[in-house]
Amino acid sequence: MKVLRRIVLPLLLITAAAMLLGGCSGDGDAKKDDAGKTSEANKEKVFTIGIVQIVEHPSLNEIREAFINGLAAQGYVDGEKIKIDYQNAQGDQVNLKTICQKFVSSKYDLIVPIATPSAQAAAGETKEIPILFTACTNPLGDGLVNDLQKPGKNITGTSDAVDVAQIMDLALKLTPDIKTIGTIYNSGETNASYVVKELLKYAEAQGMSVVEKTITNSSEVQQAAMSLVDKVDAIFIPIDNTVASAMPVVSQVANQAKIPVYVSADSLVADGGLATYGIDYTVLGEETAKMAVEIINGKNPGDIPVKTMKDLKIYINKTTAETIGVEIPQDIADQAEFFSLAAPEK
């Protein structure tokens, strides 16, 4: 009996140990499987977004930063649930096309082109990857969408359409003696050409004349501004990425000549333009981020209406007004957001 116990007991212990080891091994494999599944799930959650910007300037930078911050505020932080690849074409159309082609070949989940030239380039490269444009002045007229309420295809976005009449009405309140107005723009930018056409309509209705100066790159802006200041009572800058990138030059030339410059974006007021009546580009970026989350969650871009900002503000550069001797009527001052050349004041 003792002999039997001596044989059976070790066998039982060995069997138990084997089962325990087997159980641990199985549990480890299960944990590895679970870890693998979790890792795979995490990978699936990373949504790749390519942001492309035609050129570096404050308006577009403001939109981009607000867009990224807006995504983060909704729980989509770069490097966590999403991965953002930001590229700047530095004003070069060839670079712009190459960037968009790279986004497409990399099979990004969403392309976010900032401004009309970027949107046109992206739309020309893919009909499948969702495109969410922002700061496109005339998306319908430029053929980006079929309908503002139901864009169709793989594209939608936000528009920074300006009301030229409201800007010019403000201009005539601040500087009522305008008879001739000059404008500088890149005729290759359809957004700028569209706004200038609206300016021409307004001027004709008001009995004003318009002097146009077209440029092809930012290095030509200074000469264009210098050629205008002796011929006009004011200058109007449309939504134009080429001119915007050289806005401080326009402001310097015009301020020295005591010529008011009316612009189409708040950032151009910050860069020395006298005034505008327009949208808040931070809000534009934030609204674009909200639409991006809809797309991330599976909504078809073509079913999301294009959003045009309706909440407009008066923006005035206090430093510029003082420099050129323009007094701001109190009723306008009460509604305005003021800029110095450095920062806005409420």
Each PLM stretch: what is its role?
Residues L21-T38:
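Bacterial lipoprotein signal-peptidase II cleavage site
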Residues V46-I68, Q74, D85-V94, G188-T190, ...:
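Extracytoplasmic "Venus flytrap"
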Residues I49, F67, T156-A203, P305-A321:
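An alpha-beta-alpha
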Residues K83-S105, T214-L228:
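Structural motif
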Residues A89-N146, I237-I259, S264:
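Beta-alpha junction/loop-to-helix N-cap segments that form part of ligand/metal-binding clefts
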Residues P139-G152, T156-I178, I279-K299:
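Hydrophobic alpha-helical segments within soluble ligand-binding/sensing domains
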Residues T190-A265:
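Pocket-lining segment of extracytoplasmic ligand-binding domains
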Residues E294-K346:
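Hinge/cleft segment of the Venus flytrap/periplasmic-binding protein
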